[in-house]
């Protein structure tokens, strides 16, 4: 099999169908090989190989906008576009991104779901205004159709009549099991040939029948369409082709050529198998969606077993315990049941915990109503995805001052997924909201205490915790959580103080321990609360320590530094504040330890900076 992956449209057109199939097989082999070493989105990419090849053959990637929703299906596109030589660096520091990025030659950035059709609509408008003959092509998975933004875009696209192709990759899975009426609707797809030939027969019959018979025939056609997969799209004004076999290159190429010739908005419904070509992944739901390094033969993870439980596992276990204790606890996740650990609760309490698919806005507002009715909702969500429901957080939770708990997973640097997934903004966008209380645990025991407190707390409350395990290796005595109270972990006469928040406490402790080995010292405070701050403790601290270092995994702007400076100004206190929070730029992908070193946020870099102020 050929190992040359980069192909122009002209080169692909010269290949026979058999050669294209061989190319697809080689692509799969390469993707499996690289992802097994680097980790990545495996099953979704394996399921979209033929779709991507056909896109590149029928359309011109140099001029036609190729838009990959979420870009979990973009690896084949990267290989076809000339990234073969650097594909081995996928998701590595300073290497190829696992998502689409304009800086790598892609049309648009993607990492969050359900944006592709809106982008296609905008591209259509721009192309029309410029008088150009280009056709946007959007590849979107069936899971993304659970988000409302898709229908906002389809509604306008169908009315616009711009040339545009929506390639719907229907693997009936999304990340976890499919959720909602739309998924069930697509799964009822009928055979393309039968549906298309039926439409043609009806059209011919309507031309020759008298008026009364024509009316009856139209009613019959409308009734038939109620059980066909194209109804949804056709009623929105889009042409519909399918369902087709998404692994049959001949079928896909033919459908794309047909859609291109229509010169109207067209949806091609392609049915695929997630994980196609790797037997261990075929037909699996969440397990092979996003993976770490693994052994190809056995499918077993090659990651060293970490004896420490992940923060997600701790959250899941604590919530199970709380839910068994308090029957008014309910919860929701937006298409991430296994990622957030809510799958265990959905399994045990299916009438109290729900996965609402990719619908963060709906998730938040629906839980607001449950809080209004006297329940205690826990919303389990990645920090980066809470951004998608910001208006609902303000309008439906904060203003109403409802008893809603936001459990923000993947806070801080998340590593290989890069800019679109780093959880470094939540403190900045939640802290300004009246009625909100913000906390972060430093370790497992404090996570337990904070969750107990969150249940009893009145008003909206959010706590953040990291991807992976808590890294604090010192067992400080846990404290009872009291509203707005911090904990003084290391107390001495040093003029230097370390203020840690969440995972930042562990970093502060590591730097402090290194200082102590040099016969130096510093005070160590676990803020516990970012809002409200413990003003009493901080006023006492300001009397003795005049240099404060902030350890927090959030951006500086709107982060702990901003909150501390507001406090100091309020009481006219004169303290020098040095923040080790993140600068005003997006953080790229790579292993967390390597990213931190690049940002000079590793322990050695932090220690060097602290020593400049130590006398």
From Swiss-Prot:
Question: Which residues does the record give as thiamine diphosphate binding sites?
Answer: 72, 111-113, 143-144, 171, 278, 360
Q: How is the cofactor bound?
A: Binds 1 Mg(2+) ion per subunit. Binds 1 thiamine pyrophosphate per subunit.
Cofactors, names only: Mg(2+); thiamine diphosphate
Its GO CC terms are: cytosol
> Which SUPFAM superfamilies does the record cross-reference, listed alphabetically?
Thiamin diphosphate-binding fold (THDP-binding), TK C-terminal domain-like
The pathway is:
Metabolic intermediate biosynthesis; 1-deoxy-D-xylulose 5-phosphate biosynthesis; 1-deoxy-D-xylulose 5-phosphate from D-glyceraldehyde 3-phosphate and pyruvate: step 1/1
Q: Which PROSITE patterns match?
A: TRANSKETOLASE_1, TRANSKETOLASE_2
Instruction: Enumerate the residues binding Mg(2+).
Output: 142, 171
Q: Is-annotated flag, keyword Transferase? A: yes
UniProt-listed Enzyme Commission number(s): 2.2.1.7
Q: How does it assemble?
A: Homodimer.
Summarize the protein's role. Catalyzes the acyloin condensation reaction between C atoms 2 and 3 of pyruvate and glyceraldehyde 3-phosphate to yield 1-deoxy-D-xylulose-5-phosphate (DXP).
**What PANTHER family would the database entry show?**
1-D-DEOXYXYLULOSE 5-PHOSPHATE SYNTHASE-RELATED (PTHR43322), 1-DEOXY-D-XYLULOSE-5-PHOSPHATE SYNTHASE, CHLOROPLASTIC (PTHR43322:SF5)
Protein name, as recorded: 1-deoxy-D-xylulose-5-phosphate synthase
Q: Name the species this protein comes from.
A: Campylobacter jejuni subsp. doylei (strain ATCC BAA-1458 / RM4099 / 269.97)
